[in-house]
Amino acid sequence: MRLIRTLFVAALAMGASLAHADDSAAVQRLTGLLNKAQTLTARFSQLTLDGSGTRLQETAGQLSLKRPGLFRWHTDAPNEQLLISNGEKVWLYDPDLEQVTIQKLDQRLTQTPALLLSGDISKISESFAITYKEGGNVVDFVLKPKTKDTLFDTLRLSFRSGKVNDMQMIDGVGQRTNILFFDVKMNEALDAKQFTFDVPPGVDVIQE
């Protein structure tokens, strides 16, 4: 799924930053920042580059997240897609193809990075080795999966002034999938209906 394989690292002017290699301190710092947002809405821009730096795809859209495990990612036209989870299953709707794919949500953080922002991250240290740097109002984390059966080799997650700012995922062949978040709003009331999907008439349904 294109949207779950997406992330962005902005060039951060960190000034004098301090690197922390203590995994327990990094886990505590990351979970503290993530748990501040029980709900989150934002717009995003998405950029995917191959291993040589060639641009493969650029999109934008909006997202809504709610703990535990609910998310809605809507990519704008011309590559419109809608990805929704109610915490148990996922709908991937492509209006151009008039097709929706429905599958069980993979609860592993290494397989569904969106759950870092919306799921249960109490056992995050079981999935990742984590380090971080902090300077000024910026905190930049690097997450390395502890198993090989993952979508990515490295995931970077950055916060600015306590809000998620950008993410980047790098896979085994060097492809980088990036997301930059902006207009981020936390802990506002969200309608539960936006985390379910009613299949439009005439749309093909694929169950996986």
Swiss-Prot record:
Pfam assignment, any one: LolA
Cellular component, GO annotation: outer membrane-bounded periplasmic space
UniProt keyword annotations, A-Z: Chaperone, Periplasm, Protein transport, Signal, Transport
Subcellular location: Periplasm
InterPro entries given in the database record: LolA/LolB/LppX, OM_lipoprot_carrier_LolA-like, OM_lipoprot_carrier_LolA_Pbac
SUPFAM superfamilies, per the entry: Prokaryotic lipoproteins and lipoprotein localization factors
Disrupted gene: phenotype observed: Essential, it cannot be deleted. LolA depletion affects cell envelope stability, and decreases the ability to cause infection in a G.mellonella model of infection and in a mouse model of pulmonary infection.
Principal localisation: periplasm
Annotated signal sequence range: 1-21
GO-annotated biological processes: lipoprotein localization to outer membrane; lipoprotein transport
Membrane-spanning intervals of the chain: none
Summary of the function given for this chain in its UniProt record: Participates in the translocation of lipoproteins from the inner membrane to the outer membrane. Only forms a complex with a lipoprotein if the residue after the N-terminal Cys is not an aspartate (The Asp acts as a targeting signal to indicate that the lipoprotein should stay in the inner membrane). Important for cell envelope stability and growth.
Subunit structure: Monomer.
NCBIfam families: lolA (TIGR00547)
Record-stated family: Belongs to the LolA family.
Protein name: Outer-membrane lipoprotein carrier protein
Native source organism of the sequence: Pseudomonas aeruginosa (strain ATCC 15692 / DSM 22644 / CIP 104116 / JCM 14847 / LMG 12228 / 1C / PRS 101 / PAO1)
